[in-house]
Design a protein with these regions (language model features):
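Short, well-structured N-terminal submotif of metal-dependent ribonuclease cores
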Residues: 1-46, 63-73, 149-152
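Short, conserved alpha-helical segments within structured domains
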Residues: 47-51, 73, 94, 114
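Short acidic, glycine/proline-enriched helix-loop-strand junctions
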Residues: 77-80, 84-96, 110, 133-152
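Helix-adjacent hinge/juxtasegments
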Residues: 58-85
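Active-site neighborhoods of divalent-metal-dependent phosphate/nucleic-acid chemistry enzymes
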Residues: 3-4, 84-126
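Amphipathic alpha-helical repeat scaffolds of TPR domains
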Residues: 14, 55-56
Length: 152
């Protein structure tokens, strides 16, 4: 898959999950706006990892609270994401790059894997709240859309 890194951003799981989190209404609206703009501008990419994590996170119980979504609704939302955005899949290079990211930046495994997708596919930006906002990791800059809105 060829990705135009001048316009593409990689979306982390937390952005996808916040779209359905009614306990954080401002972040929910901000996350939905990120996806709306990304769909219109065709600028967002979703890593396969985020799709897997999205279904897991939205369908599991949260302590004594119900899941964010019933299983069937999470599946429907995942289908909508698959239909709306290009999904990037891992390969050996992504895996090896993730190991380098763990060593170079001391990332946790899933963060390293997310970063590796961006490095491998030539995407210059990750949208996430799980990294340091504005920092460059190799050729990839992290942007936390919630910081920009004063929500972080």
């Amino acid at each position: 898959m060829i990705v135009d890194s001048r316009v593409a951003s990689l979306v982390d799981t937390n952005i996808l999950v916040y779209c359905h989190d009614f306990t954080a209404p401002y972040k929910r609206e901000a996350a939905r706006d990120v996806l709306r703009r990304g769909a219109v501008n065709r600028e967002l990419r979703i890593p396969h990892q985020a799709m897997v994590e999205f279904v897991n996170v939205t369908t599991r119980r949260r302590g004594d609270r119900d899941p964010l979504l019933p299983r069937e609704e999470a599946w429907r939302q995942a289908e909508d994401l698959l239909n709306e955005f290009p999904v990037l899949y891992p390969n050996e290079s992504v895996f090896r790059t993730a190991m380098l990211g763990m060593a170079a930046y001391r990332f946790a495994w899933y963060d390293a894997h997310l970063w590796a997708y961006a490095e491998h596919y030539g995407i210059s930006e990750i949208l996430s709240e799980d990294f340091e906002h504005g920092r460059w990791y190799g050729t990839v800059r992290v942007r936390n859309p919630f910081v920009e809105l004063g929500l972080a």
